[in-house]
Regions:
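Active-site ligand-binding patch in enzyme domains
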Residues: 144-149, 156-172
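Catalytic cores of nucleic-acid editing and processing enzymes
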Residues: 1-6, 170-171
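Generic secondary-structure signature for well-ordered alpha-helical cores
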Residues: 19-26, 68, 128, 144, ...
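N-terminal glycine-rich anion-binding loops that anchor highly charged ligand groups
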Residues: 28-42
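Zn2+-dependent cytidine deaminase-like catalytic core
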Residues: 38-140
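Short, basic and Ser/Thr-rich N-terminal targeting/leader segments
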Residues: 30-34, 56, 153-155
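Short, basic/aromatic recognition patches
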Residues: 6-29
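Flexible, active-site-adjacent loop/turn segments at secondary-structure boundaries
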Residues: 18, 32, 43, 112-113, ...
């Protein structure tokens, strides 16, 4: 059972990971902007967000930055760590396992072919404690466009119905 302090810390650190991801929104295409915060004994030892252009991934930066302090730590990740990579490089789930992270808290499961539950499954099989869905509503808003594109194959387009912001003319 999670203690009230642990639950409060989880929310705080996931909130930080979401803030890191938000700061990179629109810069990481074709990948989603992901935030990762590595915490050991209540102290942030490393944090990162997906780099512009989509590489390297957040975990791929944060885990090496944490170094030996990643062993036994908790990683707060806004989206499920990838379970495979199109480039053949090490997956983010492997980075977390190899570093000795003890627990991974994930806001949103990634429906893409490179994750789709495989990242979480790989972490669990390796003996890591994994929790999903923390701040899921905030993550759903953050990843609305990405999730739409993965699920439909089309970009999400919103047209404002704000008459003041729309400045176009249509002819018959």
């Amino acid at each position: 059972m999670t203690s009230p302090k642990q639950a409060s810390d989880d929310i705080r650190f996931m909130g930080r990971a979401i803030a890191l991801a938000k700061a990179r929104m629109g810069q990481t295409w074709p990948n989603p902007a992901v935030g990762c915060v590595v915490v050991r004994e209540g102290e942030v030892v490393a944090e990162a967000a997906t780099a512009p252009g989509g590489r390297p991934h957040a975990e791929e930066q944060a885990v090496p930055a944490a170094g030996d302090r990643a062993r036994g730590a908790v990683a707060y990740v806004t989206m499920e760590p990838c379970g495979a990579r199109s480039s053949g490089r090490t997956s983010c789930s492997h980075f977390l396992i190899d570093a000795g992270v003890a627990r991974v808290v994930v806001a949103a499961v990634d429906p893409s072919p490179f994750a789709s539950g495989r990242g979480v499954e790989r972490l669990k099989k390796a003996g890591l404690e994994v929790e999903t869905g923390l701040l899921a509503q905030e993550a759903a808003v953050l990843y609305e466009g990405y999730l739409h594109r993965v699920e439909t194959g089309r970009p999400m387009v919103r047209i404002s119905d704000d008459g003041e912001g729309f400045d176009a003319r249509f002819a018959a």
